[in-house]
Amino acid sequence: MAPKRVVQLSLKMPTHAVCVVGVEAHVDIHSDVPKGANSFRVSGSSGVEVFMVYNRTRVKEPIGKARWPLDTDADMVVSVGTASKELKDFKVRVSYFGEQEDQALGRSVLYLTGVDISLEVDTGRTGKVKRSQGDKKTWRWGPEGYGAILLVNCDRDNHRSAEPDLTHSWLMSLADLQDMSPMLLSCNGPDKLFDSHKLVLNVPFSDSKRVRVFCARGGNSLSDYKQVLGPQCLSYEVERQPGEQEIKFYVEGLTFPDADFLGLVSLSVSLVDPGTLPEVTLFTDTVGFRMAPWIMTPNTQPPEELYVCRVMDTHGSNEKFLEDMSYLTLKANCKLTICPQVENRNDRWIQDEMEFGYIEAPHKSFPVVFDSPRNRGLKDFPYKRILGPDFGYVTREIPLPGPSSLDSFGNLDVSPPVTVGGTEYPLGRILIGSSFPKSGGRQMARAVRNFLKAQQVQAPVELYSDWLSVGHVDEFLTFVPTSDQKGFRLLLASPSACLKLFQEKKEEGYGEAAQFDGLKHQAKRSINEMLADRHLQRDNLHAQKCIDWNRNVLKRELGLAESDIVDIPQLFFLKNFYAEAFFPDMVNMVVLGKYLGIPKPYGPIINGRCCLEEKVQSLLEPLGLHCIFIDDYLSYHELQGEIHCGTNVRRKPFPFKWWNMVP
């Protein structure tokens, strides 16, 4: 709204004013009055609402034919309910009277031209633009909240372009309009009024680099859509055609929330009278938007597509591993996409390269890949092969000296939805690995951490992963879906559970059963040898302490009980003070619904079965899960990674709408 408008009346000549439908105009009835006048009477033509604003303690409302006292504590306000068909077709008359006179001492006449001007967006979050009588400028979270939403137009709808749509200041395809939020400008009133007044669309300077606005002229040609606001373009004089009552615009988001951007932008339209110097703004209507956040999907969401790389090394190709992935995705009814060697340049760690998420508005949703700053062999794959129609792309570059291992996205995960001490996280919480507090070790880059935090809907939790050589959270934790009330379990790697299992097997008489039995390229280690190895015992005592520290953080920050956690047997060893998996790390699995692709641990064979596999099955299969153990030893484990590191899963978005939560 514009500041309070005051229309001054005159006894000498009629006054003319523009009145916006639904907007009150204050009328000055005190400045020009006949000498001796002490009361007045008001009348208005049909379509004009006249009412008095007065101090009830000092002014008495007249009854019947009595007149209003000409008191400074009584003010007149007028408004119109519809737009005028002609100029000055609404009329208000004010008659002034003296002490004992029935004849008016003088009269003032006010001619009003009604105009209907409003800027409308989807404040109700229904996917449709409807006329709103409420607050359009403010943005509120929650199921009772309101406010429009913008998508960052980070996909590429035109195959002829090599860049995301948001990089272009012109429309690349009509499909691109679906990624934008519609905005309607109502501009109903006499054409002659718009001939002498301007409608100006504005974007604040601080928001101009965050949005673009395209004006639609109803055609099916790209030339019918012109950019009118955006970077380097802060205002636009609307080109209204004679008789035109509604003009459609499309608003495009350009930047995600980040450390320097809360995600809120505003646009406004003003009715301006250029007939005065300086020009006078008669009315302003403002609408607000929030940029949709980038949202991660946890393992509990159904899988849609699994990505894996075809590679070649000194041991040959990973063709057998690819066959196992094909079998797993077939069981899980999930699409399989194999990245060829020419595109991955023999970089197999596709989990480290990128993270899949999505963005959503009431009218549209699409997946968005977050490209990590690691920039190794796969660095071009997300941009060149995944970015496309309705598949967006975002990244964050980091300054020199460049990325550390903790900047890879094996060090980025998200929990299922949780409730912590009465606080709900309906989209879960992001988990990232870091150094031990105050230790000065490796950390994920600030640019990435700031981006994740700024999305607001999945408040990040920092864990301690710097004790590991690679330093990724997926080396000691994962989540699996369950069909019970909780809906999931947290799996934690557990050296103590593994040593306990081996001790039990020793006491049962299987001490000579050997780890790595069946592997050609690895020396066997019997249970007796492993239990007697003081260095191995010491290393795993350290690893267990590190995992226990994270266990307590996860219980506190995710609201978990011990019954929500499953300990998966696992041993580690220290190399240059950092831990690596002693045998294939089973929590580093890929989760496809109820089917789990688990690294084959090559544990001691007892009664024809691997005791580690048997233990894991006994823990997980009662939860309705199917354990499929897959050999990744040569192609992944020996290179300090496992199945999760070498795969990536795009999952279905949450059914829950992010705008219904309260961060």
From Swiss-Prot:
Record's subunit section = Monomer.
- Residues bound to Ca(2+) 2 are D155, D157, D179, K364
MF-aspect GO terms = calcium ion binding; protein-arginine deiminase activity
The entry's cellular-component GO terms read:
cytoplasm; cytosol; nucleoplasm; nucleus
Q: Which residues bind Ca(2+) 3?
A: E353, D371, S372, N375
Report which reactions are catalysed by this protein.
L-arginyl-[protein] + H2O = L-citrullyl-[protein] + NH4(+)
Organism domain of life? Eukaryota
| Residues binding Ca(2+) 4, per UniProt | Q351, F409, L412
Q: Which UniProt keywords are given for this protein, alphabetically ordered?
A: Calcium, Cytoplasm, Hydrolase, Metal-binding
Top-level class of the enzyme under EC nomenclature: hydrolase
Listed name of the protein: Protein-arginine deiminase type-1
Q: Where is the signal peptide?
A: none
State the family it belongs to.
Belongs to the protein arginine deiminase family.
Whichever gene encodes this chain, its name is PADI1
Function as written in the Swiss-Prot or TrEMBL entry: Catalyzes the deimination of arginine residues of proteins.
* Cofactor dependency: Ca(2+)
Subcellular location(s) per record: Cytoplasm
**A Pfam family assignment:** PAD_M
Checking InterPro entries in the record gives: Cupredoxin, PAD, PAD_C, PAD_central_sf, PAD_N, PAD_N_sf, Prot_Arg_deaminase_cen_dom
- Keyword Transmembrane helix listed? The answer is no
Task: Provide the tissue specificity.
Answer: Detected in epidermal keratinocytes (at protein level). Epidermis, prostate, testis, placenta, spleen and thymus.
